[in-house]
């Protein structure tokens, strides 16, 4: 729904997202707000956590979660407006690569990608 509020986004946490996919048994998900990343040269992602000097890609027990520090990686951006894109084939290659990277990292098919606040801004893959 369009509320008039600014659309805000932060780096995706692949560790927590993968855990959520596993716990919920998800097999097909939507990646939303991809258009907000449109003019970033690099897109940050939390690819792992550092806990007590150890790097892990597994979601930690709640008792140690507070000690987890994000380990960031950076993906190439696409530096163009994608809000008018309506097909997967018309998406810039770097945007498709980002979606496929997230899909592989979380172990779940991304069947829908939103590229704007409008109802028509949903791409079915």
Predicted region positions:
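Non-transmembrane, aqueous-exposed alpha-helical and coiled segments at domain scale
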Residues: 1-125
């Amino acid at each position: 729904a369009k509320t008039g509020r600014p659309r805000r986004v932060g780096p995706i946490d692949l560790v927590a997202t993968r855990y959520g996919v596993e716990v919920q048994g998800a097999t097909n998900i939507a990646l939303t707000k991809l258009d907000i990343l449109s003019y970033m040269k690099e897109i940050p992602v939390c690819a792992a956590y550092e806990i007590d000097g150890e790097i892990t890609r597994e979601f930690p027990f709640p008792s140690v979660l507070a000690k987890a520090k994000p380990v960031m990686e950076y993906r190439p951006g696409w530096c163009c407006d994608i809000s008018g894109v309506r097909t997967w084939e018309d998406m810039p290659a770097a945007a498709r690569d980002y979606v496929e990277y997230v899909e592989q990292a979380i172990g779940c098919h991304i069947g829908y990608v939103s590229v704007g606040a409008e109802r028509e801004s949903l791409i079915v893959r």
